[in-house]
């Protein structure tokens, strides 16, 4: 990875949510109804064009075969463990910034693939330059896992973005049941 300073770092969050802003069902699984082929292709393209992907353990376990350079948040170890293209880390022991500094990693583009704890961690430890939020307008997940703490609707999501110096910049229609809202840092 090339050296860079924080001003040129791009950190893009990606999430697809139900109309009540959940990313998973009550068991922590992503139901088929939450998927959008157009969103998936856009998401995969952005991950492919990123220097580093940050994700949680559940997402990693589901998509282990990826050849992308990944930083995986997990509570199952102390500090961090580097293995070729994967770095496992315990966010209770070491921050994202500390890992990047300790391992002399200087990505220009970081993609955030979730889940909720990872999204929150980036707000706490780093920052977002963009957030791409896809919404399945025809699907509700009662008792699901919210995308962010204390966010159950668009008003609360927009407020959370504003609190972190982000505003909505674009709205795209991905398919008949899915829109994507893009937020940028101001």
Locate predicted features:
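Enzymes that bind and transform nitrogen-containing heteroaromatic metabolites
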Residues: 1-186
């Amino acid at each position: 990875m090339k050296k860079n300073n924080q001003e040129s770092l791009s950190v893009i969050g990606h999430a697809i949510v139900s109309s009540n802003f959940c990313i998973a069902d009550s068991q922590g699984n992503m139901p088929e109804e939450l998927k959008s082929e157009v969103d998936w292709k856009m998401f995969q393209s952005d991950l492919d064009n990123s220097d580093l992907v940050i994700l949680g353990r559940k997402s990693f376990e589901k998509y282990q075969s990826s050849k992308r350079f990944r930083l995986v948040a997990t509570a199952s170890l102390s500090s961090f463990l580097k293995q070729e293209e994967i770095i496992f880390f315990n966010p209770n022991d070491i921050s994202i910034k500390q890992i990047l500094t300790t391992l002399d990693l200087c990505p220009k583009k970081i993609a955030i693939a979730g889940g909720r704890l990872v999204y929150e961690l980036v707000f706490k430890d780093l920052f977002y330059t963009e957030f791409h939020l896809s919404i399945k307008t025809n699907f509700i997940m009662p008792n699901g896992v919210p995308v962010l703490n204390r966010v159950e609707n668009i008003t609360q999501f927009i407020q959370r973005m504003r609190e972190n110096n982000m505003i909505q910049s674009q709205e795209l229609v991905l398919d008949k049941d899915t829109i994507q809202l893009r937020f940028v840092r101001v």
